[in-house]
Structure formats: structure tokens, C-alpha cells
């Protein structure tokens, strides 16, 4: 790896130059970076050095890699206020983004041990387990596992679940999300979420766990969400 006077590694200098272009607006949200080969020529360096620079920028949340397409400037993060009653599709549209949800699988299965207590179930009770992928402006940002109660939403799997679950609940069951218990913390991206999101297993992620209640104050479902580390910020105004 090359260094220059001052003993600053070249990959950090290249990172600083690319970062300055992004933060100044010369490179805008969604812009594609030159290819690794082109960057090697621009900065007169090796591909190994360029990849170190790009990895640093990715860790900072400034760029992201689309498989077989290259590197792009990361879009603005979606922001979530936990005190507001909203859903993913509404959240995106309110912030000028285009949402999409894709159902990866939907099964009736025995309740996983880790969600048995919050859902107030017994060891061999059944739940509907939905795994879904959420997109903002065509970019996969969140892998979600929805744990739904058959007693509250019978025959749920017969409906189109490639969209807002909130709207399905309201339209077919007259059930409305009104409150939730939310916990969130950084974690490592698990294998199943990493594969769906197109990132490496073990990369940083933000985990959100929501226990949702309906208008009657009863538990409705539990969501476990893995967000790309560069795609969401959480803000709460206590004024």
C-alpha cells in the first residue's frame, strides 16, 4: 500500500477525496461511482488500495454496492419517529420515496421460542410466519419477519401480502395498529437477512423489534426487522 509524505496511507487520502465530492454535492444521492478500474487510473493506484477506500466509505454509510452493478452514493436515510403511528409504505411516501414490499415466504408454523412470551403463546402453538423484503426507491433496505396470530387474523395467507400488512388488517379484519413496544440496537447481519439484502453476513445492521397492539389494547403481532446500517435513522421529539 502506498503512502505519501506525512505517512497517511493512500487509501485514506482517496477516501477523503471521494468523501469530499459526496458531501459537497458533486456526487449526489444515487449517483454511480466510476468502476474500480477507472478509479485505479484516476488515482494512479492499485485495485487493492481502491477497495480499501471504498470499504471505508461503505462502513461510513456514504456508499453502497449493488451486486454486479457497482458502487453508488447512498440515498438519504429514512427517518422513523417511534411516537408516530405509521407503517413502512406510508413512511416512505411521506418522505418522497417509493416503497415496495415483497413476500419471500409465508407459512403456518410452530411459534419460535424467542417470541413465545411476548405473543403470550404456549410452546407448541402455531403462528403465521411471514418473511418479507422492503424496498425504498428500488433498493432493498429491510428484511422483516412478521409473527402473526392465527386467532386474530385467521386465513391470513390467502391474501396478497406483497404490500402493507396494516392495510390487510384494516380491510379484512377491522384491526388497527394503535400502539407498540419498540426496541432497537445495532447487531450483525444474520445469514438469511444478508442473502436477501445482498450484503455480506456479519455486516453491521440495525435490528428493530416491535410488539404491536390493536385498538382494543390486545397483542396483534410481533415484527423483527433487520435494516441496512445506512438506511434508517430514528428520531424522537419530546417537546
Curated annotation (Swiss-Prot):
UniProt KW Zinc keyword: no
Gene that produces this protein: phnR
An individual GO BP term: negative regulation of DNA-templated transcription
Keyword Calcium attributed: no
Domain HTH gntR-type: 8-76
PROSITE patterns registered for this protein in UniProt: HTH_GNTR
The organism's place on the tree of life at top rank: Bacteria
This protein's name: Putative transcriptional regulator of 2-aminoethylphosphonate degradation operons
